[in-house]
Amino acid sequence: MPKTTYELEREANIARNRALIEQLELKNAAASVTGSVNPKVSAKPKPPQKPRAKPVQPIKREKRILEDTPRRASARLRKSVINLVDETAAQKRKREQEEEAWRRNEEEERLAAEERAREAKKARHHELDLEVLAGQEEWEPGALSGLSSRLQSLLQARHPRRRGDQDAFVFDNSKRENVEVAALRERLQNMAIVARAKVTQDRVYSAAYHPEPTKDLIFFGDKHGQLGIWDARAPADETEEDDVDRDQREAGKYWRLQVHWPATAQSSISCIKVDPIDAHGVYTSAYDSTVRSLSFTSGISREVFAMEKVLITSMDLPPASHEMWLSDAEGWVTHLDLREDKTRRRAYQVSDQKIGCVSVNPTNPAFILTASNNRALKIWDVRKLRKLPAPQGVLELELEDVEKIKESKEGTAILRGEWKHDRSVTSAYWDPRGRAIVSTSYDDALRIWDIQPSLMTKNPPFPDFRPFARIRHNCQTGKWLTMLKAQWSPNPDVYPHFTIGDMDHSLDIFGWKGDLLAKLSDKERVSATQAVTCSHPSVVERVASGNGSGRCVLWAPAHLVAE
């Protein structure tokens, strides 16, 4: 039978393809011999690839042995083999009664397990000791007592939060300021990585540095409500890990406490503050709508405040005071007196959108900053709001009520200043002097204000509330990184400066006039954005940072690496 036109065409295509393949194979063979398909063009040698930064490897720890819980089993499998043919009526009744009792017991156990599971998902409002906070964390023997003794050692001295002089580091002569800036720049640029560790299990959301000058004790809060306590320069436990390079091993000692519950994204620790009275405890606020206090004296975590299903985004405490200010996702700021019952509060809705940050002026606590998703940074004078009567210790003013007070004759000085950014304002903080402000915004800019102290003694709104410096800075962190927030160094004895993570994996330090003082990086050891930063309140050359995987870094003078 003669072939069709289609078959002839198909065979011709196959033949052409085979010839082409054979030709290509010959060219490849020639290239392997001569080094190039075209001898006129010499192949350029590939440049050697730079070694990628390797993340620090967590120490392998033995898992805690937990008690075995009874598992549910099938009734068919648990039933004993019975000869039903020879079974008497009495035996049958007894068997059925036993099976019915077993089924009832099984159902009760199932309902109890479901109830325990429901309770486990709820926030914990009672007092919790270190044993409970440790939970199912894989701790080495004696680690819990080691943490307790470490916290107890901080009680030997009081370290109240210090505030600076509002006129400090304001120079009439620019030469004097240049000398001060140059000296600080030299100290900061000498810093390098001296310690690394995976302090928390999940993404770092917040951090705080304890002011004890002889220690580098840093607190990190993560996405799932875990508080990591890192003694960064403590002698590490001697563990032989042959499969981990010495340079990739963790430094110091750390402990993980499940302070907020449940251990999900609903409990992210939004802010950590060391007790400003004596530094003998830390406060943590979280998305589980609670604020808790961990006492170093007793080792007990207690609830300070709780709200109804509202994300607490930030908090601040003025120096030498028992007051606390909170901000939340509904646009409210809440004032607490920590000496009163936790049900007493004064709350003011000052924005129609989320307030991501609240900051209290350390030298004039009546002036608070709010940074909101509605692009506005505002300075409030809350003295007149405090004078309003609070029946039964509770006062809640909604946005309409606050606006009415602002428009009244008595409320003209409540809002002292306002500045609209191009996009949402991530954060805004007062410096330790209570004079300068730095804001971070999604419009990729850092802005700095200088508020003259004389303006705070007068009642009218500030005549010109305009930033004097604007620094370009990439703040597009996206979904998987913690939002960048410029953080002032709390040390009042040194030229004011602030730290912020950079999307190029460096840590940037700026002076309060906007000068870049240092850009710390280590491409071989850091391969992720250092989104969260904090500085030592008592030692200048100490900065800590954390990333999206819970890995944290201590930056300090390079000579400390060899110690």
Indicate where each model-derived feature is located.
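Intrinsically disordered terminal extensions that flank WD40 beta-propeller domains
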Residues: 1-204, 558
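Conserved short-loop catalytic and cofactor-binding motifs
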Residues: 5, 413-416, 474
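WD40 beta-propeller repeat fold
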Residues: 139, 143-339, 347-363, 418-420, ...
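Acidic, glycine-rich loop-and-beta core segments that form the ion-binding/anion-interacting portion
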Residues: 362, 368-416
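Long, repeat-rich segments with strong aromatic
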Residues: 372, 432, 436-442
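Short acidic alpha-helical/loop segments enriched in Asp/Glu that coordinate divalent cations
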Residues: 391, 451-461
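A surface-exposed beta-alpha-beta supersecondary segment
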Residues: 396-410, 460-493
